[in-house]
Regions:
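N-terminal Sec/SRP start-transfer signal
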Residues: 1-13, 244-245
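Alpha-helical transmembrane segments of integral membrane proteins
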Residues: 4, 115-119, 124, 128-148, ...
């Protein structure tokens, strides 16, 4: 019962934060010097008399509700106030994410394919990164001060210091230009109409180089963090006691020390998973992948602010869900942290 109350309380906090962030983001995008009504009539400007154009412009502004204050427009956009044209609630909370002025489609139709691609590449990048950094960090902590540990520390510092776009350019030159192992860009074999697993492997092949870049870019920080957490855990008194009692080293490391190191590592893992959604903006543009990051940059360049705002809200929801998962994970992995307390 206490767990349920805690979860409900946390969800209530997240809903409050969601509304605050969404209002701030809506106000921020409304400060951008752009007029949707004028943009919509721009193609007709030369064919209309100035007075006719101005009358149509004012009528369209009134029809679109642009003459209302920002609070009224936010409530209408969110779905808390009735739409001016239909008289019904038809906003974000009802599933209406707006209309893309550039693609001439509903925002939902525009963002569905890129969302799938972004989630696909980020999940695989997370699996690869964790599969390398956790064993590597544990091994370096156990063999602290050894040659391999010293080499890894130097290597991770170098990797951590290099911006992700530099890593991407270097890897493109090595693996795509020199070795020709992977394609430079794209999301599938041109002209191919694969289905099933063949389509999956073809897509994975084209995503391989971006995945390698994202994984390599994460090795430095994550490996050092896991190593540091494990060194702290191995220095605890109960670990020394377990070793003094003759407990097997593998049991000491993986059953006792790793469990204590897991709490800060969980924060890192989930936080990093959320950060690569924003980091994928660079990767998707570098490799010309049809993902949320590339779509977001395109929306800003094309002054498609309803689309950009919807993408920003997607990142907000992902971050809030991640924060909830972190809080709930603490009580699951560490007996010292209990939700009912």
């Amino acid at each position: 019962m206490a767990v349920t109350k805690y979860i409900l309380r946390r969800i209530a906090y997240l809903i409050l934060v969601f509304f605050i962030v969404s209002f701030l983001m809506y106000c921020l995008y409304n400060l951008i010097p752009s007029d949707p009504a004028r943009n919509q009539l721009e193609g007709m400007k030369k064919s209309l008399k100035p007075e006719v154009y101005e009358r149509m412009y004012q009528e369209l502004r009134e029809e679109m509700g642009l003459n209302d204050n920002v609070l009224v427009r936010y409530a209408r956009w969110m779905g808390l106030s009735a739409d001016k044209q239909t008289g019904k609630l038809h906003g974000l909370l009802e599933g209406n994410f707006g209309y893309s002025s550039y693609f001439k489609k509903n925002v939902v139709e525009v963002i569905l394919p890129p969302i799938g691609n972004t989630i696909f590449i980020n999940i695989f990048a997370t699996i690869l990164a964790l599969g390398i950094t956790i064993p590597l960090g544990i091994y370096c902590a156990v063999h602290k001060g050894g040659k391999f540990d010293n080499f890894t520390q130097v290597f991770t510092i170098i990797g951590y210091s290099i911006p992700i776009y530099i890593i991407a350019l270097v890897f493109i030159y090595i693996f795509a230009v020199l070795l020709r192992w992977f394609p430079v860009s794209g999301m599938g074999t041109p002209g191919a109409e694969y289905t099933g697993m063949r389509a999956f492997w073809d897509k994975l092949y084209y995503f391989s180089l971006p995945l390698i870049v994202m994984t390599f870019g994460s090795l430095g920080g994550m490996t050092r963090y896991v190593r540091s957490a494990m060194i702290d855990a191995l220095s605890m008194d109960h670990i020394k006691t377990a070793r003094a009692k003759g407990v097997r080293e593998k049991v000491v490391i993986y059953s006792h020390a790793w469990r204590n190191a897991l709490l800060p590592v969980i924060t890192l893992i989930i936080g990093w998973f959320l950060s690569i959604f924003s980091g994928s903006v660079i990767i998707e543009n570098t490799f010309n992948l049809n993902g949320m990051g590339k779509l977001y940059i395109g929306a800003l360049n094309n002054h498609d602010y309803e689309l950009a705002l919807a993408i920003q809200m997607f990142y907000t929801v992902v971050s809030l869900i991640g924060a909830l998962v972190i809080d709930l994970s603490y009580g699951l992995v560490d007996p010292r942290v209990r939700i009912d307390k």
